[in-house]
């Protein structure tokens, strides 16, 4: 009798490169760009609750021109964490007629732009987990368990989680000042070699996470 076998998860940089195509990389870059715009909006209004790598580098983030922001966004993986476990847990325990908790007005997704980005991230992660399961762990920067949970959601469940996912989204490696200062400087000076080194370092970190 046939059994459902979970798809193999990409765990090396080489496997990752072979399992994705230009279209998904373009989509990831677009997601990153939208998230960076939400981050810069939050920084420009001095919104509380932002990660260290945003707050400490505020002037660097806000000094970037559009071309430099696009260069920062150009990575084959999401530059934002989507930590959905709290949202999964809250959704399991919420009664059907129970309203979701009030939205926080802090952090990356405290305003409408950020909340829209959080919803989009949830739907993108769900679609990617379903359509490209082998590469999802590295593209999204999440573990295999989260990918499997996402893939099992139906649309109604996904929508309920997406509406309250703002607090689950944050800048990836948000405490790593070294990573972000180097990436921002490389983008500002149009140093393509340094940008590539930064991007590759991120792929290696996510590959290690996927193997864990």
Task: Go through the PLM ranges and name each one.
Residues 210-212:
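C-terminal structured domains
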Residues 1-99, 103:
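Structure-specific DNA junction-binding interface
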Residues 33, 40, 83, 87, ...:
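Alpha-helical ligand/cofactor-binding cores
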Residues 102-120, 168-179:
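Membrane-interacting alpha-helical segments
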Residues 114-166, 170:
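Amphipathic alpha-helical packing elements
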Residues 33, 41-44, 48, 62, ...:
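Generic surface-pattern signal
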